[in-house]
Amino acid sequence: MAEYSGLTKTSSALPRLSSKRTYSLMRAEAPSESVPYYSYCLRLRRLVLIFVNPLYFMRYRNWLAQDDTLSELLELINRQLTEKGLKVEKASAAVVDATIIQTAGSKQRQAIEVDEEGQISGQTTPSKDKDARWIKKNGLYKLGYKQHTRTDAEGYTEKLHITPANAHECKHLPPLLEGLPKGTTVYADKGYDSAENRQHLKEHQLQDGIMRKACRNRPLTETQTKRNRYLSKTRYVVEQSFGTLHRKFRYARAAYFGLIKVSAQSHLKAMCLNLLKAANRLSAPASA
């Protein structure tokens, strides 16, 4: 209660209510002969409009986004799902991938400098969202962020990390592997293939499931090609999670500006996704 009082006390824009007015508003008694129905509805509506103020939720969300509170909340939800038997406690595999989240602002109308390979060479910054960056994906230029995600073998999101869209995947694998037990197999696409990442897996006693990437003048061997084909079949769970985020939760585009707020929204969406998977498991008919 002390933290809540301290938080609202500094919010000068929030409405200040006297104790007498608050008491009178909270006496929204059920409709009766002495309290007509329309009067009851009016009192209840005034009560909701005052206490369910968007400013309260906005400041509370921003407060949670300042540190790792939402990451800890995601871990807490996963731990509770494990205790209820809805999630595997120690999965033998971890699947890593990334998806693009477009910025909430309109795209900037300006030219984009690209190199000979079509990659963006100039650092163009949007006029509203200062943290978003451009990236070329499937032949299209997109402005936004990149969500690096780690799921277990069942598709439950365990950890995520948000960067500008132009950040390369291979440099952001170690933060996703924190907390993994030894012996876990890490599956990832060729975007995460690098000597540093393979060494990181070896040092932390994690099994290498990263697809190999062909280099210039050094194509993949037949064995590496077969290995990549096999590993690609094990990564569908994280791609299904991204598909659910985009379709059911409409998260192909962010709702806020800035890296911190987009990261907060991604964590909240991940919690909803995990709870949805658990609810679907509860409603599924028991196998004979």
Swiss-Prot record:
Keyword DNA-binding set for record: yes
Biological process according to GO: DNA transposition
Keyword annotations from UniProtKB, A to Z: DNA recombination, DNA-binding, Transposable element, Transposition
Domain of life: Bacteria
Annotated GO MF terms: DNA binding; transposase activity
InterPro entries: Transpos_IS5, Transposase_11
Family: Belongs to the transposase 11 family.
Protein purpose: Involved in the transposition of the insertion sequence.
PANTHER family cross-referenced by the UniProt entry: TRANSPOSASE INSH FOR INSERTION SEQUENCE ELEMENT IS5A-RELATED
Protein's recorded name: Transposase for insertion sequence element IS1106
Phylogenetic placement of the source organism: Bacteria, Pseudomonadati, Pseudomonadota, Betaproteobacteria, Neisseriales
